[in-house]
């Protein structure tokens, strides 16, 4: 009943208006799973390959018809007839079929679309929600959201070097309340920015992209918004940063052009330490560049006991990169992006490896998203306790928050909100 009888991919558009891959997988009993693949703006050099056509006459070279053809041709030919409940075997077949270390032949966007659609079809056939099918009976922890309310870097057209400024409603009693708290701060921040004569247009992930002068300027606005919304910074709501520092690491220096700073790796660590001393920062993502292992080690030795240090470009959801980081004592948290590695199986392997090393995991969206809310289910399935899925604007972001609210309702009295259990030190 769970044999795959049809696999069909199409080219659709993501939240930035760029093409992406969507896949439908149909099973023998008539059930169907559908998955759409996200894409990033700031991408790590070690990520699996997102296959683009390169035809400048079509979507400015960003079309994905080759990836679609790979799904409808080679992948479908090899997977039709396979049992959709055998996720590990199916993912392994696609990895072997591709035959490259970074999924560059068929494309990680082709392989991931099939991998996730297979899981969703199998869950439907088993009459289970996706979080339960993937996570089993123990899947019940609702994650604390990292809500990106001010954008900089590659996600906005302003002089702020750091890419994301986020709030984390750790004192909420449940996900529904966490979303409410975040929404109230978001709308209060909009009023504060408007009153200061600053723009309130939003960036790729729904956060505001005002023309602020510095990192501290952005943090001060957020603190004021938290307080005016009736909450206590550092108690009710914590702060988080995504530096995306690989984007401004040039010639061995951290070139923060917006602030006119040129910092050595040691000076960059001191800069971040000073921010953590002055603001209630719970988490810093990509505080050092993806191949600055010495900088990462210094950052971890300096702040790792009290701050969550998340590797995104550093680890790219890749078990091999993560193992190297664990061995070197770099970072203490894994950012989980399914399209960085390209299959559900490898994603879950990375989360398990992080857990064994006592690293936390943060389930994450990409800046180019769709209405697909799979990562909400995966956050609960893995009990990872944290999710990063943008601001309280744009339906591509809210789809994930709304799905978490639904999952909490389904879990009923067994649901647990991670809350302050994620705090370090």
Swiss-Prot record:
<dbReference type="InterPro" id="IPR029017">
    <property type="entry name" value="Enolase-like_N"/>
</dbReference>
<feature type="binding site">
    <location>
        <position position="337"/>
    </location>
    <ligand>
        <name>(2R)-2-phosphoglycerate</name>
    </ligand>
</feature>
<dbReference type="GO" id="GO:0000287">
    <property type="term" value="F:magnesium ion binding"/>
</dbReference>
<keyword id="KW-0964">Secreted</keyword>
<dbReference type="InterPro" id="IPR000941">
    <property type="entry name" value="Enolase"/>
</dbReference>
<dbReference type="InterPro" id="IPR020810">
    <property type="entry name" value="Enolase_C"/>
</dbReference>
<keyword id="KW-0479">Metal-binding</keyword>
<feature type="active site" description="Proton donor">
    <location>
        <position position="205"/>
    </location>
</feature>
<dbReference type="GO" id="GO:0004634">
    <property type="term" value="F:phosphopyruvate hydratase activity"/>
</dbReference>
<comment type="similarity">
    <text>Belongs to the enolase family.</text>
</comment>
<feature type="binding site">
    <location>
        <position position="366"/>
    </location>
    <ligand>
        <name>(2R)-2-phosphoglycerate</name>
    </ligand>
</feature>
<feature type="binding site">
    <location>
        <position position="285"/>
    </location>
    <ligand>
        <name>Mg(2+)</name>
    </ligand>
</feature>
<dbReference type="InterPro" id="IPR036849">
    <property type="entry name" value="Enolase-like_C_sf"/>
</dbReference>
<keyword id="KW-0456">Lyase</keyword>
<keyword id="KW-0460">Magnesium</keyword>
<comment type="pathway">
    <text>Carbohydrate degradation; glycolysis; pyruvate from D-glyceraldehyde 3-phosphate: step 4/5.</text>
</comment>
<dbReference type="GO" id="GO:0000015">
    <property type="term" value="C:phosphopyruvate hydratase complex"/>
</dbReference>
<dbReference type="InterPro" id="IPR020811">
    <property type="entry name" value="Enolase_N"/>
</dbReference>
<dbReference type="GO" id="GO:0005576">
    <property type="term" value="C:extracellular region"/>
</dbReference>
<dbReference type="GO" id="GO:0006096">
    <property type="term" value="P:glycolytic process"/>
</dbReference>
<feature type="binding site">
    <location>
        <position position="163"/>
    </location>
    <ligand>
        <name>(2R)-2-phosphoglycerate</name>
    </ligand>
</feature>
<keyword id="KW-0324">Glycolysis</keyword>
<feature type="binding site">
    <location>
        <position position="388"/>
    </location>
    <ligand>
        <name>(2R)-2-phosphoglycerate</name>
    </ligand>
</feature>
<protein>
    <recommendedName>
        <fullName>Enolase</fullName>
        <ecNumber>4.2.1.11</ecNumber>
    </recommendedName>
</protein>
<dbReference type="InterPro" id="IPR020809">
    <property type="entry name" value="Enolase_CS"/>
</dbReference>
<comment type="function">
    <text>Catalyzes the reversible conversion of 2-phosphoglycerate (2-PG) into phosphoenolpyruvate (PEP). It is essential for the degradation of carbohydrates via glycolysis.</text>
</comment>
<feature type="binding site">
    <location>
        <position position="312"/>
    </location>
    <ligand>
        <name>Mg(2+)</name>
    </ligand>
</feature>
<dbReference type="GO" id="GO:0009986">
    <property type="term" value="C:cell surface"/>
</dbReference>
<feature type="binding site">
    <location>
        <position position="242"/>
    </location>
    <ligand>
        <name>Mg(2+)</name>
    </ligand>
</feature>
<keyword id="KW-0963">Cytoplasm</keyword>
<dbReference type="Pfam" id="PF00113">
    <property type="entry name" value="Enolase_C"/>
</dbReference>
<feature type="active site" description="Proton acceptor">
    <location>
        <position position="337"/>
    </location>
</feature>
<feature type="binding site">
    <location>
        <position position="367"/>
    </location>
    <ligand>
        <name>(2R)-2-phosphoglycerate</name>
    </ligand>
</feature>
<dbReference type="Pfam" id="PF03952">
    <property type="entry name" value="Enolase_N"/>
</dbReference>
């Amino acid at each position: 009943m769970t044999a795959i009888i049809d696999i069909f991919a199409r080219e659709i558009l993501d939240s930035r208006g760029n093409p992406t891959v969507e896949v439908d997988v149909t099973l023998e009993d008539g059930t169907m799973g559908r998955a759409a693949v996200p894409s990033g703006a700031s991408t790590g050099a070690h990520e699996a390959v997102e296959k683009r056509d390169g035809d400048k006459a079509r979507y400015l070279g960003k079309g994905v018809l080759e990836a679609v053809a790979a799904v409808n041709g080679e992948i479908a030919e090899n997977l039709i007839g396979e049992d959709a409940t055998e996720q590990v075997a199916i993912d392994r077949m696609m990895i072997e079929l591709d035959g490259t270390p970074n999924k560059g032949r068929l494309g990680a966007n082709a392989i991931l679309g099939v991998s996730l659609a297979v899981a969703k079809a199998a869950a439907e056939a088993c009459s289970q929600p996706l979080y339960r099918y993937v996570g089993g009976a123990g899947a019940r922890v609702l994650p604390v959201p990292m809500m990106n309310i001010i954008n900089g870097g590659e996600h906005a057209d302003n002089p702020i070097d750091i890419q994301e400024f986020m709030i984390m409603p750790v004192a909420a009693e449940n996900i529904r309340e966490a979303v409410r708290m975040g929404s109230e701060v978001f709308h209060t921040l909009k009023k504060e920015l408007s009153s200061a004569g600053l723009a309130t247009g939003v960036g790729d992930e729904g956060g505001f992209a005002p023309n602020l002068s510095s990192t501290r300027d952005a943090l001060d606005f957020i603190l004021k918004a938290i307080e005016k919304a009736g909450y206590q910074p550092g108690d009710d709501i914590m702060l988080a940063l995504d530096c995306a520092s690989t984007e401004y690491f040039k010639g061995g220096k951290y070139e923060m052009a917006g602030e006119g700073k040129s910092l050595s790796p040691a000076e960059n660590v001191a800069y971040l330490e000073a921010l953590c001393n002055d603001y209630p920062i719970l988490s810093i993502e990509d505080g050092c560049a993806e191949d600055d292992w010495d900088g990462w080690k210094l950052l971890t030795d300096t702040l790792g006991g009290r701050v969550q240090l998340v590797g995104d470009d550093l680890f790219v959801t890749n078990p091999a990169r993560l193992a190297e980081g664990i061995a070197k004592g770099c970072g203490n948290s894994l950012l989980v992006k399914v399209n960085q590695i390209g299959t559900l199986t490898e994603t879950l392997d990375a989360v398990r490896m992080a857990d064994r090393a006592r690293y936390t995991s943060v389930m994450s969206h990409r800046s180019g998203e769709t209405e697909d809310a799979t990562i909400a289910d995966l956050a609960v399935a893995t009990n990872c306790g944290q999710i990063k899925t943008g601001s309280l604007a744009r339906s591509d972001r809210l789809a994930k928050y709304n799905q978490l609210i639904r999952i909490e309702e389904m879990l009923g009295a067994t649901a647990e909100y991670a809350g302050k259990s994620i705090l370090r030190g």
